[in-house]
Amino acid sequence: MDVEGLVEQVVSGLGFELVDFETSPKGRLMRVFIDIERGVTVDDCATVSNQLTRVFEVENVDYDRLEVSSPGLDRPLKKTADFERFAGDEVQVRLRMPIGNQRNFIGVLEGLSEGVVRLHTDKGDVAFPFDEIEKARLVPKF
């Protein structure tokens, strides 16, 4: 059974975006990170948690603990839609392979077009294929 697919179906059915899904090595702990344009509330987390608990019971998904939360201020960017939605925000990106001896970049996300992500950094503009991103997240504003 594809547990992540099941979680995605439940979360999107409730009107939320599944940002990330993590399980412990033995699958005993499940972490679900949700988001919505207006921001996630504690009640939203409870609603998703209750619905997932019911679905897991019906589908016989074996687990010990379920955690549902917002992705936080340093939200990870994983999908192409994330790179469009957060254009204009400051991001931190780690690439799989270096560009000019550099794998880590911090800059303002200019967006994504035709599979290429563009950043404006202190050292100038940089562009790289979306598929080359190992990890990306928002830089919190304080």
UniProtKB/Swiss-Prot annotation:
The processes (GO biological process) annotated in the record are: ribosomal small subunit assembly; translation
According to the lineage, what is the superkingdom? Bacteria
CDD domains hit by this protein: YlxS_C
Cited Gene3D superfamilies: Ribosome maturation factor RimP, C-terminal domain, RimP-like superfamily, N-terminal
For this UniProt record, give its keywords in alphabetical order, as a comma-separated list: Cytoplasm, Ribosome biogenesis
Q: Where in the cell is it found?
A: Cytoplasm
| Residues in coiled coil | none
One GO CC term, this protein: cytosol
Matching HAMAP family, A to Z? RimP
Chain's role: Required for maturation of 30S ribosomal subunits.
Indicate the family of this protein: Belongs to the RimP family.
Q: What is this protein called?
A: Ribosome maturation factor RimP
- What is the organism lineage in this UniProt record? Bacteria, Pseudomonadati, Pseudomonadota, Betaproteobacteria, Rhodocyclales
